Regions:
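Repeated loop/turn-to-beta-strand initiation elements of outer-membrane beta-barrel proteins
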Residues: 79-85, 113-119, 153-159, 188-195, ...
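Structural signature of outer-membrane beta-barrel channels/translocons
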Residues: 74-80, 106-110, 149-153, 183-187, ...
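Residues that define the transmembrane beta-barrel architecture of outer-membrane proteins
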Residues: 41-43, 65-69, 97-101, 138-142, ...
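Detector for outer-membrane/organellar transmembrane beta-barrel domains
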Residues: 139-212
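Cleavable N-terminal export/targeting peptides
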Residues: 1-44
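Outer-membrane beta-barrel "beta-signal"
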Residues: 222, 226, 249-262
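Transmembrane beta-strands of outer-membrane beta-barrel pores
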Residues: 51-57, 87-91, 109, 123-127, ...
Length: 262
């Protein structure tokens, strides 16, 4: 019911970001062939780290309204295939614990002029499961995803879907998530405005998590992000969900973000 891990150390992320692949340099007395250079540059490694005032996953707080540390590392091939991992600190209590770790892989590429698709499989893992009664709860689950995006001038748009089939960790139920994202780069400034809307049909719907029994619900957000220097950026967003407002869980919130990516 979550999406990332925040306990991944900032140092780990910064080291990961420093691993960005570059062409092979001279190796003492060994001659580097053109083929070796091409093979090396076919892969790239990127990293990111962020501090957020509240970890909101599809509008629902997974950090009880408190700050969270997040980060991830991706390895990509020029063919479009990639693998990666992302982590976040959480306050999941019983049985989710204090850490979410996401492992994923997929393919992304341009399928038409200005149109990009992204398809893959995401695995949500909770390695610090809180199990005081030794019930050995099943918390981890898989979720395939797909999205299509395009950019026209300063405007970007994405539509996506994620579907978790029936799994024990979801109580034997499934979950469908549909969403759309928009971005607008404000000309002459380092600021980008963003908007998001999502719809959940399943056990992860905000109203269902809030205890209403309604397994459908909406989430939304509006935000601004500003590039500060290099890969450093700051952002703020207003996040809301459909259903009862539970403080530190399903209430509307203003979320601040400080992030670095390389």
């Amino acid at each position: 019911m979550l999406t990332s891990v925040r306990s991944l150390m900032a140092a780990t992320l910064l080291v990961g970001s420093a691993f960005v692949a570059t062409p092979v340099l001279a190796q003492d007395d060994e001659e580097v062939t053109e083929a070796e250079v091409e093979a090396d540059s076919a892969f790239s490694i990127s990293g990111n780290v962020a501090l957020v005032s509240d970890y909101r996953f599809r509008g629902v707080s997974l950090s009880a309204g408190d700050p969270a540390l997040q980060g991830g590392i991706d390895v990509s091939h020029e063919s479009g295939f990639y693998i990666g991992t992302w982590a976040s600190s959480i306050q999941g209590g019983t049985p989710y614990g204090e850490l979410e770790l996401d492992v994923y892989g997929g393919w992304t590429g341009e399928v038409a002029s200005g149109v990009t698709v992204d398809v893959g499989l995401l695995y949500y893992v909770y390695p610090t499961t809180d199990d005081p009664l030794n019930l050995d709860p099943d918390t981890d689950y898989f979720e395939p995803y797909a999205s299509i995006s395009t950019t026209v001038g300063p405007v970007g748009a994405t539509a996506g879907v994620a579907y978790a089939w029936e799994q024990d960790s979801l109580g034997g139920n499934d979950n469908l998530y549909l969403y759309t994202d928009f971005s607008l780069a404000i000309p002459g400034t380092p600021v980008t405005a963003t908007a998001h809307a999502g719809y959940t049909d399943g056990v992860l719907a905000p109203p269902f998590l809030a205890g209403t029994g309604d397994d459908t619900g909406l989430d939304w957000s509006l935000g601004l992000t500003a590039a500060v220097y290099g890969g450093l950026s700051v952002g703020v967003s207003y996040v809301g969900v459909e259903g009862p407002s539970i403080d530190g869980f399903t209430d509307d919130a203003i979320v601040a973000t400080l992030s670095f990516a390389a």
